[in-house]
Amino acid sequence: MRPNNRENNQPRQIKITRNYTKHAEGSVLVEFGDTKVLCTATVEDAVPRFLKGQGQGWVTAEYGMLPRSTHSRMQREAAKGKQSGRTMEIQRLIARSLRAMVDLKALGERAITLDCDVIQADGGTRTASITGAAVALCDAINSLIENGTLKTNPIKGLVSAISVGIVEGQAVCDLEYVEDSAAETDMNVVMMEDGRMIEVQGTAEGEPFSHEELLTLLDLAKQGCNQIFIAQRKVLGL
C-alpha cells in the first residue's frame, strides 16, 4: 500500500498559488503533497555576454534548499562557500526545461531568472520546481506583455515534470521520500504539453529495469504530467 493510499498512477495533491510574494515579476508556491517550493521569476534587460548583440533572450535558473526543509538541518551552501554537484545538476535541469517553453528570439535581449527555493522536502523537489517555475515564468512573460514591452507572447507551451519509479516491484508515479529512498528504479521525466519529452533521467538503484518497465514508467509519467498540465492551466486561467 502506498502512502496516503494512493493508486500507483496517482500523483500527490498538487496546489499552485500564484503571486505568493510581491516583488518578483512571477511568484509561485507549488506544493506536491508535503513538498513545497517557492519559485520566483526575475526579468532583467540584459543577457549573458555570449548572447550580446544576437537579438535573443535567455532563461536560466537557480535552486536551493532551506536548512530545515529536511528532517535534520543542512548547512547552507553559501556558508560552505560552494554549491554541491547535486544542486548544480538540478538547476541546469530546471533551466533547460524552461528554455524549451520559450521562443528566445521573441523574448528579445532580456534574461529571466527562475529562483527555486525548497521550503519543505518530501521527494520530487526538482520536478515540483520545474512545474512551479513554469507558471512563474508565464506570469513574468505576461507582465512584459501587459506593460507593452513585448508585443507577442514567446511562450510555446507549458512544461511539467514528475517522478516515477519501481518500488517493491510496482511501477508508481510521483514518489514521496519514503518511496524514493526505497526505489529499485528512480526516474524523472520532463514533458511539453504536446507530449514531447524534454528530459528523461532514469537510474536502476537495485536490479536493472527492462525495456517493458521503461515503457510502463514513461506511460505513468505522461499520465501524471497531463494531470499537472490541467492544474497549471486552471491556475493560469487558460
From Swiss-Prot:
It catalyses: tRNA(n+1) + phosphate = tRNA(n) + a ribonucleoside 5'-diphosphate. Phosphate binds at residues 86, 124-126. One of its GO terms (biological process) is rRNA processing. GO terms for molecular function: 3'-5'-RNA exonuclease activity; tRNA binding; tRNA nucleotidyltransferase activity. InterPro entries: ExoRNase_PH_dom1, ExoRNase_PH_dom2, ExoRNase_PH_dom2_sf, PNPase/RNase_PH_dom_sf, Ribosomal_Su5_D2-typ_SF, RNase_PH, RNase_PH_bac-type, RNase_PH_CS. CDD domains: RNase_PH_bact (cd11362). HAMAP family: RNase_PH. This is Ribonuclease PH. It comes from Haemophilus influenzae (strain PittGG).
